[in-house]
Structure formats: structure tokens, C-alpha cells
């Protein structure tokens, strides 16, 4: 397995990446000498990989249990966390236990917060099974669940002891989840690492089918992009805020859709919205907006909003965006990550955040919902395992 050391301030952990390397994953987990391995996943991932992984751990490492949670963003809440905490304690976990987050971003967030809270902190290992998780969520210390009014509003920062990733697991993903991850790759290219753009313009495929070497390149480049902005900002409160590009409208859409819109698809159209806001504020020209539409469209997701999600539900949730409070703003403004050009976020008061008038942002949201054309697949297309 290829090993990269992830560094965020005083936090370091290894990211081990391979293909067809489940035996290596079991070996690495066994070396942690846990008193109990809690393999946390949704029911679909449990059938694909979870029960097998737990059985292998029981044979070679020690006691192991599979804990499942309901699939979907709509179940990423405190109720699910409470149920899992009770189940973990009844399974026999103690302070020497290890939580194994086996799945996508939803599982990783739930497992991360569970590990942080059990006995005030036990070890966490990410075994990501989606593109979003492999190249985005496991490269962050943020662990959070949703509140009723918005995404990721209840949480903390907690590092894994390591990440163990097998790209062969991506072979069972539905196309929706591949596209979701690729939207985060586009975000990294537009906001942080524009050297990626030409390759992506040539290689992105709306059908979501990629050779393993292309996916490995995207993961490697995304690791490098995140390192650029988090190496000295482990809490993502300064330059790391650029990773929120596209997430203001994206999170609001994802939450308003009750999980029908994937995280990446929300971020995709959220980046288009951010580019259009920046254009209307005079920071970028129409060509940059078109570049956003082109790259997001090539991923295979929509660059406009789905007709079945009421715009008032989206604009309501914009008021609960998780970037509130970083800057003193008038009540009629949102704090948004906006660009001056590719790889050049706009800064104010030392942060990559720009005050954007609510009336303007809400207008852009309404216009994206009213746009007659769609590029690529519907944002709210059916999904699968995460």
C-alpha cells in the first residue's frame, strides 16, 4: 500500500492507499491491538464488506462487532449517534477499542463523532469506500452530524490514527456516488490547484466510468490540494476555509432535498452559484462562470437546481450556514467563499470569505431553479451505497 503522511499542524496520520488490499487493511488494524473493533457502516456496506472484515478481524486480531446505521444524509443526526453509542457499549467496547469507519462521508462523520465521544475519545480508523470519502472527508479532522435546520452543525475536531483505503471497493459504487466524489475534485481544481484543470477537462466522463489509474491520480492530487490549505490550519478556520467553496448553496440544497441530492452534486451546482455571485459582484467574468458549468457538467451532474426542491427551503437554510460567525457581517449578508480567478480565493480580514448580499444570493438561487436547461444528469438522481 502506498503511504502518504497527512500533516495538519501538530497532527499527523498515515494515509495508506492500495488496490485489492483487504488483507493489508486487516493486518494494519490488527497491529493496533484493540480490545474490540467496532466496524461501523450502513446495511449495504455491511453486506458488501463489513461482515467479512469483522470476521477476518475476529480470526486474526480479536473481538469485532458490526454496527449498522440507516443509510442516507437524513439519518446523520444525534438520534442515530445516541443509538450507536448504546450499541457500542453493549457490544463491550472500552477505552482500548477502535472504531472502524467503513463507508462514505456519512459513515465517517457519524463514526468520527462516536469515537470522539466514547470514553471522551477512543481510536478511530477510516476505511473509506466512496470517492468523496477517499479524497475529501478522511482528509479533515471535522466530525459532525446534522441539526434539523442544517448540515454539520453539531460536532467537533477529532483525528483518525490512520486511513486505510482500497480503490477496489469503488467498483461497487453506483454512478451517482462516483459523480459526487468527482465534484469535490473539481472544487479542488477550481479553488486550490488549477494545474488539475486541463487533465480534468480531458478525462471527466458523465458516465462515471474511470480507470483505476485515473482515480488514483485524482486521489493523489486531492490529497496534495488539501495539504496546501490545511498543513498549517488543522481546524480549517483560516486558509482551510477555501475547502468550503460551493458548500454554502450546496449544503443548503443537500439538506433541503432530505438526501435526494448527493453531497457532491450539491457542491457542483453550489460552485456554479458561487461563480455567478462573484460575477455579479464584479470579481470574475462570464468565462469563469462558463468554466464552472463546463467542468461540473462533464462530471455528469446538473448545473441548475432541481425543480422538486422548493427554493424557499434552500434560501431558508442558507441562513444557518456553518460559516456564520467567522466575520462580523450585516444580517442581510452571507459569508461565502468566492474566487477572483481559478486558484485565487478572495480574502477579507485575512480569511477567504466574502460578504455576499442575501438578496443577490437568493436571486441567483431562484434563477438557477428557473433555468430551463440541465447539463448532465439530474442532481437528484437515485443513489445507492455510501
Swiss-Prot record:
Binds 1 Co(2+) ion per subunit. One of its GO terms (biological process) is aromatic amino acid family biosynthetic process. Co(2+) binds at residues 184, 247, 263. One of its GO terms (molecular function) is 3-dehydroquinate synthase activity. Pathway: Metabolic intermediate biosynthesis; 2-deoxystreptamine biosynthesis; 2-deoxystreptamine from D-glucose 6-phosphate: step 1/4; Antibiotic biosynthesis; tobramycin biosynthesis. Keywords: Antibiotic biosynthesis, Cobalt, Lyase, Metal-binding, NAD. It comes from the Bacteria. Its cofactor is NAD(+); Co(2+). Pfam families: DHQ_synthase, DHQS_C. It catalyses: D-glucose 6-phosphate = 2-deoxy-L-scyllo-inosose + phosphate. It is an enzyme of class 4 (lyase). The active site is at 142, 244. NAD(+) binds at residues 42, 73-76, 105-109, 129-130, 140-142, 151-152. Disulfide bonds: none annotated. Its EC number is 4.2.3.124. Catalyzes the intramolecular carbocycle formation from D-glucose-6-phosphate to 2-deoxy-scyllo-inosose (DOI). Belongs to the sugar phosphate cyclases superfamily. DOI synthase family. This is 2-deoxy-scyllo-inosose synthase. It comes from Streptoalloteichus tenebrarius (strain ATCC 17920 / DSM 40477 / JCM 4838 / CBS 697.72 / NBRC 16177 / NCIMB 11028 / NRRL B-12390 / A12253. 1 / ISP 5477). The lineage of its organism: Bacteria, Bacillati, Actinomycetota, Actinomycetes, Pseudonocardiales.
Amino acid at each position: 500500500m502506498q503511504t502518504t503522511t497527512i500533516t495538519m499542524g501538530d497532527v499527523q496520520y498515515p494515509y495508506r492507499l492500495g488496490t485489492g488490499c483487504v488483507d493489508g487493511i486487516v493486518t494494519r488494524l490488527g497491529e493496533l491491538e484493540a480490545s474490540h473493533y467496532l466496524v461501523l457502516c450502513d446495511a449495504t456496506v455491511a453486506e458488501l464488506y463489513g461482515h467479512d472484515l469483522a470476521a477476518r478481524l475476529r480470526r486474526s486480531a480479536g473481538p469485532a462487532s458490526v454496527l449498522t446505521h440507516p443509510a442516507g444524509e437524513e439519518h446523520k443526526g444525534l438520534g442515530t449517534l445516541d443509538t450507536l453509542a448504546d450499541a457500542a457499549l453493549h457490544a463491550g467496547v472500552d477505552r482500548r477499542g477502535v472504531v472502524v469507519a467503513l463507508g462514505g462521508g456519512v459513515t465517517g462523520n457519524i463514526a468520527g463523532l462516536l469515537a470522539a465521544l466514547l470514553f471522551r475519545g477512543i481510536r478511530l480508523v477510516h476505511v473509506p469506500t466512496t470517492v468523496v470519502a477517499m479524497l475529501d472527508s478522511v482528509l479533515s479532522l471535522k466530525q459532525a452530524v446534522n441539526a434539523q435546520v442544517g448540515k454539520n452543525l453539531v460536532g467537533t475536531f477529532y483525528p483518525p490514527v490512520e486511513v486505510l483505503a482500497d480503490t477496489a471497493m469503488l467498483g461497487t459504487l453506483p454512478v451517482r456516488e462516483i459523480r459526487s466524489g468527482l465534484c469535490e475534485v473539481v472544487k479542488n481544481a477550481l479553488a486550490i490547484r488549477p494545474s488539475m484543470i486541463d487533465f480534468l477537462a480531458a478525462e471527466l466522463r458523465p458516465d462515471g466510468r474511470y480507470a483505476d489509474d485515473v482515480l488514483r491520480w485524482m486521489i493523489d492530487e486531492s490529497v496534495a490540494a488539501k495539504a496546501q490549505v490545511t498543513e498549517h490550519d488543522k481546524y480549517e478556520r483560516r486558509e482551510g476555509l477555501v475547502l468550503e467553496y460551493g458548500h454554502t448553496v450546496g449544503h443548503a440544497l443537500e439538506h433541503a432535498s432530505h438526501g435526494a441530492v448527493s453531497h457532491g452534486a450539491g457542491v457542483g451546482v453550489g460552485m456554479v452559484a458561487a461563480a455567478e455571485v462573484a460575477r455579479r459582484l464584479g470579481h470574475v467574468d462570464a468565462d469563469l462562470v462558463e468554466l464552472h458549468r463546463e467542468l461540473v457538467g462533464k462530471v455528469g451532474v446538473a448545473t441548475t437546481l432541481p425543480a422538486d426542491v422548493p427554493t424557499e427551503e434552500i434560501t431558508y437554510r442558507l441562513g444557518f450556514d456553518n460559516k456564520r460567525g467567522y466575520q462580523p457581517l450585516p444580517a442581510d449578508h452571507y459569508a461565502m467563499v468566492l474566487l477572483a480567478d481559478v486558484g485565487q480565493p478572495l480574502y477579507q480580514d485575512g480569511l477567504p470569505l466574502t460578504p455576499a448580499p442575501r438578496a443577490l444570493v437568493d436571486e441567483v438561487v431562484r434563477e438557477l431553479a428557473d433555468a430551463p436547461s440541465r447539463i448532465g444528469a439530474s442532481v437528484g438522481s437515485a443513489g445507492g451505497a455510501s
